[in-house]
Amino acid sequence: MNRLKDKVAIVTGAGDGIGRGIALAFANEGAKVAVCDLNKTAVMDTATIVREAGAEVIAEQIDVRNPAEIQSFVAAVKHRFDRIDCLVNNAAVMPIAPADSIESETIDLILQVNLRAPILFSRYVIPSMREVGGGSIIHMASVTGHNGHPGVTVYGATKGALIALARGQAIELAEDNIRVNTVSPGTVDSPMLHRFLAENASDVKKARMAFDRIHPRGKVGSIEEIAAVFVFLASDEAANITATDIRCDGGYAVQGQQPTG
């Protein structure tokens, strides 16, 4: 408890799933939390949960495709809390789009949400982190940034790009004591997985079991397991960790199996 006491953290894409889990985990460790999401109802629900955990919170509906909204949100967080210590770039989209038929509009959507938004969020929080003597930027990557996965090639490309982005940012910002890292989950038992199965699997139960089987420990990860990694990277315990990607995937990326069924 209190590993993040008095730190101010921004979590994007916090309307549900892993983003909400990270926000709650940060709150439980003493952080003040700023959450945003495209879904207003969902992000306000997250704010309520965080507040009930005893943390101060600010929540806004924003479209991360809009640079002005990103800049405005970061400014609002700085105005409210007078500092920013941590940024979690979690917001993402993952349309299923085969390489031979993906539409230009879909490419633009994935690039804007998954890559441009983290770059812009980083740009706007860096001055505040410099003011307080450092900070932690954590980008949500994915095993798809390491291994090839059919149907999500552009999504995987953006996740691989985030890993490269973090390494470059980490070196550039090291003298400012701003650490930059990525986390690459495997499959996680989350609303995103549930939506993916509902939209793409003919037999949801069978497909869900297939995802469990391809992970060496026999099950997919949990939101709490992923959130714990983010807490660690945001804390002073990770003071010497930067330019690093932590694969939190139960060994999935090493064996590289694809789900079937």
Question: Which role fits each region the language model picked out?
Answer:
Residues 142:
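Residue(s) in the substrate-gating loop at a strand-loop-helix junction
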Residues 8, 15-17:
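Conserved glycine-rich cofactor-binding loop
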Residues 147, 242-261:
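Short C-terminal tail/terminal secondary-structure segment
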Residues 127, 171-175, 239:
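Alpha-helical segment proximal to the catalytic Tyr-Lys
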Residues 182, 190, 204-241, 248-250:
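C-terminal helical subdomain
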Residues 122, 158, 166:
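Active-site helix of classical SDR
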Residues 98-99, 103-111, 211:
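Substrate-binding pocket helix/loop in short-chain dehydrogenase/reductase
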